Amino acid sequence: MKVLFAASESHPFVKTGGLADVIGTLPRYLKKIGVDVRVVIPKYSAIKSHLASEFNFIKYFYVPVGWRNKYCGIFQCEYMGVIYYLIDNEYYFFRDELYGYYDDGERFAFFDRAVLDMLWQINYKPDIIHCNDWHTGMIPVLYKIQYKQSSFYRGVKFVFSIHNLLFQGNFDKNILGELFNLDGSLYENGSVELNGAVSFMKSGINYSDKISTVSRSYAFEIQSPEYGENLDGLLRSRSSDLWGIVNGIDYDIYNPEKDNMIFRNYNKNNLRNKMINKLKIQNDLNLDINENVPVLAIISRFTPQKGMDIIKTIGERLVSKHVQLIVLGTGYNEYEEYFRYLSSKYPRNVSTNIYFDDVLAHKIYAASDMFLMPSLFEPCGLGQLIALRYGTIPIVRETGGLKDTIIPYNKYTGEGNGFSFANFDGDDLLRIINDAVDYFEEKDIWNNIVTHAMESNNSWDNSAKPYKSLYESLL
């Protein structure tokens, strides 16, 4: 079985969010269970230079973008057993950022056609092309209308994964003719039209053979008007083809027993070493050094989706108590300024770090007692999975993948690996934090919760198997 992943980013080459983590990890775990996987992404100037130098130039050709023919170079390397391709065009991809440009529609129109043209150019025919998010949504459209009849391309199947339905790639309807050489009937019949625009996301959903998303609960949620972003009706109509598969994390990268980024390695049988991480980070971040004070962590993009609005409503009530808060991330200016304000007013209780640093993130995961993730919605979420791995107890809102992966602590049975609340409300969040702090003060109970958290299995080994089953259902 041959599967080609097409995506807009992949760790470790280039990353802006969780999509890159999935594309950088899942293929390796699929390979371990017998799937021949390859990956293709754009050749951005932002790709780390020491990794970019590992790629070898294969060939070049020209890709039609409307009436123009655009240069396309193909580079290849093998990384951790998986073959990666880079699609090169300096005009489209040598820019300061990956996304957010006026011509993003044209950039990914080029990429989507280049992926299909590349297959013939390098004589590689996958059984399945696995597309990811809106950036690759036009690949199955182009295939079924312009490529399917060719003997070389015949028989290829498509999986389209929704990592976040909010971002839909909606562009002016004129791009169908101007960039894809497609007639307006696709827009008029509604198969690619959404809210008066051509939607790459809707196109991918409509023209793929199977659809997946990154947790079971999110698969149900996006079929409702509340979460469906005006695509709930389409998703309900395709519910029999919609799979919800929870993301995993790479247990080799996130391993408190071997992690060389943290102060002291530990496991569930040696939690005293976790405490050493806590005392060290309190010292480094100029917080009061006290092992009995619960340390709460936020490692996140600062956006409304991540629950920042309800955190703002309780921030001062929270940190004026006997707790500490460590914040790491960037995002909307109003949230950055709020966290700066908290740390200036409560400098011994709050450490605000308005940037992202992977080493510091690992240290915070290892050192903290609790991890806040009160998302408005969350397709899957990786932060809570990493926190579990490090015995840092997640406090989450019951939505999407958070609901699937965090089992609320039950004081009667002793079961559970975290704490959760249902309503998107600051008072409810504060109440559940207070409950967690109460249990934190009862060390035997708390250590039991930590042990359960560290025993949770969220490795990609678990998630790769249902993906293989999904592929097999198409063959």
From Swiss-Prot:
Single GO BP term: glycogen biosynthetic process
What the entry lists under Gene3D superfamilies is as follows: Glycogen Phosphorylase B
Briefly state the protein's biological role: Synthesizes alpha-1,4-glucan chains using ADP-glucose.
Its recorded name reads Glycogen synthase
Broadest EC class? transferase
> What family does the database annotate?
Belongs to the glycosyltransferase 1 family. Bacterial/plant glycogen synthase subfamily.
Which PANTHER family does the record associate with it? ALPHA AMYLASE DOMAIN-CONTAINING PROTEIN, GRANULE-BOUND STARCH SYNTHASE 1, CHLOROPLASTIC/AMYLOPLASTIC
Q: Which Pfam families match?
A: Glyco_transf_5, Glycos_transf_1
Question: Which GO terms of the molecular function aspect are on file?
Answer: alpha-1,4-glucan glucosyltransferase (ADP-glucose donor) activity; alpha-1,4-glucan glucosyltransferase (UDP-glucose donor) activity
> Which pathway does the protein contribute to?
Glycan biosynthesis; glycogen biosynthesis
Identify the domain of life: Bacteria
Q: Where is the signal peptide?
A: none
